[in-house]
Design a protein with these regions (language model features):
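N-terminal hydrophobic/helix-forming segments and targeting peptides
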Residues: 1-368
Length: 368
């Protein structure tokens, strides 16, 4: 576990050092590509900028498995200059207090340099979701540019990982860690895809376009790896969550069986392995985008605090997850990739399938 922990946290720290909003994920994209090259995995980039890495399986009849996460996070896009300050459009769901005056932000230049500033309150009509941004040190900028909350890139705080963008860099980091483990051990039965999408926060755009295009084989089982607001039954510190649905869909039992079989295997191997199961209806994840286009889908979720940087009492703060939930999620999806061909043999399926002879006989005796 110590090697897994060190590598997983290093990947996540590297990803977190690259702030990104929808349509401006360039530096996260480069970091993902860099790590994939270090792992020794080839990848392709589709016409929409989504990244697809692949590990080939040993059994051509086994279902492929895809694990999907997005690279963007809610923030602002600076669109124009206004009397020496800058108009910025909200990109994705941000807390209501983001539209107040005095919220510290970082403006991200094309070379990655960050310029500090703060909001000056709402600009225009409320439904336009715009703010005015004032730079700490006035200078001429060339829009469009991303602006993000001035929060920590990455911090390990006891049992918590705190980041501006846990959602969904934790998903991306977990996929990269799982691919690292799978590439250095025995090959999985089916092909395994690591998928890194764009513009999720403004409507699952990258995932929808990729699913529509049929980039993944139609028989692929798709797992969405998300960081989602903790709630009863999906509580921080109680383990990775098998997500059985979201606000839009109940996901498919066949795809979920891969995760259930992986959970059973891990709990037999490690008596303390924690895993929860819950329908998380607080929002919609990328599994729904693939479900609409006919894929069998399921999901995992890291229970998240300060969802979209919204802290109690309206404060803007870093998101956070439990470090052991994160590491457990990596173990779960790694094991799931190895259990694709074994998913019909979950304990529950076997118990339901195999009617005890005495009960069968009693039904026969009393059936007429």
């Amino acid at each position: 576990m110590s090697d897994l922990r060190e590598q997983a946290l290093e990947y996540l720290s590297r990803l977190g050092s690259n702030p990104a909003t929808a349509f401006k994920e360039d530096r996260v994209i480069e970091t993902v590509k860099e790590i994939l090259s270090e792992i020794g995995l080839e990848h392709k980039v589709d016409e929409f900028g989504n990244i697809i890495a692949k590990i080939s399986g040993t059994n051509p009849t086994a279902n492929p498995l895809a694990i999907v996460a997005h690279m963007d996070h809610p923030g602002f896009e600076i669109t124009s200059n206004h009397d020496g300050n800058y108009i910025a459009q909200a990109m994705g769901g941000i807390p209501p207090s983001s539209f107040e005056s005095g919220v510290p932000v970082q403006v991200i230049l094309p070379d990655g340099k960050r310029i500090l500033g703060s909001t000056m309150g709402m600009f225009g009509e409320e439904n336009e979701r715009q703010v005015l941004i004032k730079l700490d040190q006035p200078q001429d900028l060339e829009p469009p540019l991303s602006a993000v909350f001035d929060l920590t890139d990455f911090e390990l705080d006891g049992e918590h990982i705190r980041m501006r963008a846990v959602d969904d860099l934790a998903g991306c980091g977990s996929i990269l860690s799982a691919l690292t483990r799978l590439s250095s051990g025995d090959a999985p039965p089916g092909d395994v895809y690591g998928v890194f999408t764009r513009a999720e926060e403004v409507g699952l755009v990258g995932a929808r376009l990729m699913a529509e295009a049929g980039t993944l084989p139609p028989e692929t089982l798709v797992i969405s790896a998300e960081s989602s607001r903790s709630l009863p039954g999906a509580e921080m510190g109680e383990g990775i969550v098998i997500r059985v649905g979201d606000a839009g869909f109940t996901f498919t039992a066949d795809a979920e069986s891969v995760l259930i079989r992986a959970r059973e295997t891990l709990q037999q191997r490690e008596s303390g392995f924690k895993c929860q199961r819950q329908l998380m209806s607080g929002g919609t994840c990328e599994a729904s985008a693939f479900a609409v286009f006919g894929y069998q889908t399921t999901g995992i979720a890291f229970p998240l605090g300060n969802y979209h940087n919204g802290a109690p009492e309206g404060r803007i703060e870093a998101e956070y997850i439990n470090v052991n939930d994160y590491l457990g999620g990596i173990e779960l999806i790694t094991e799931a990739a190895r259990r694709v061909s074994d998913r019909v043999n979950t304990a529950f399926r076997q118990r339901i399938r195999e009617v005890p002879p005495n009960l069968r006989q009693r039904m026969l005796d009393t059936g007429n």
